[in-house]
Amino acid sequence: MESIILSIAIFIGVLLGTSVGTFSGSGISAGVGASSGSGISAGVGASSGSSTSVGVGTFGGSSTSVGVGTFGGSSTSVGVGTFSGSRTSPDVDAGSGSSTSPDVGAGSGSSISAGVGTFSGSRTSPDVDAGSGSSTSPDVGAGSGSSISAGVGSRIGTGISTTMNARVAVLITAAILSAPVTAIALLEARR
């Protein structure tokens, strides 16, 4: 009888010691996130429509990046400027249709990231070049309607968390560990 109680206690203890999360519809993963429609991530963000990203932003329509700005025809960016057709900002030059800048340049209706620009027309920059409707950054680049993440991204519709696989593994392990104890307890009970 004590063995049965012990095996049940082991099984429950292993289950309680496992935290599990699952994601359906869209997912957020530690450090990396990607979505179609909108997405939030710490470090890298990509979206088609709008997104918020810390450090780096991927642009397909409009986006907001901490320390960079929001761009959709016109925008205001911390330390950069406001853009509608054309703009002038300290240490940054941009025309309407094309731009050349030592650091960052942006055309009409496009966007700027730290050392990275997306341009409606054409531009030249020492760091990164991008066409209309897409952007490339030193870390992650994504076009409109798709996203690429430097680590792992959960896609819309279904999201599978690695902790779900961990939970299945723990359940199997708990069953294996408790099976011999349960079998011995049953044999002793029959005696």
Swiss-Prot record:
Domain of life: Eukaryota
Signal sequence, renumbered to the chain: 1-17
Region (Disordered): 82-148
Mitochondrion is among the record's keywords: no
Main localization (coarse): membrane
Membrane topology of this protein: Single-pass membrane protein
UniProt-annotated location(s): Membrane
Keywords annotated in UniProt: Membrane, Signal, Transmembrane, Transmembrane helix
Record keyword Membrane present: yes
Listed transmembrane segments: 168-188
Gene Ontology terms: cellular component: membrane
Miscellaneous comment: Completely overlaps YRF1-2.
The name this protein goes by in its record: Putative uncharacterized protein YER190C-A
Naturally occurring in which organism (per UniProt): Saccharomyces cerevisiae (strain ATCC 204508 / S288c) (Baker's yeast)
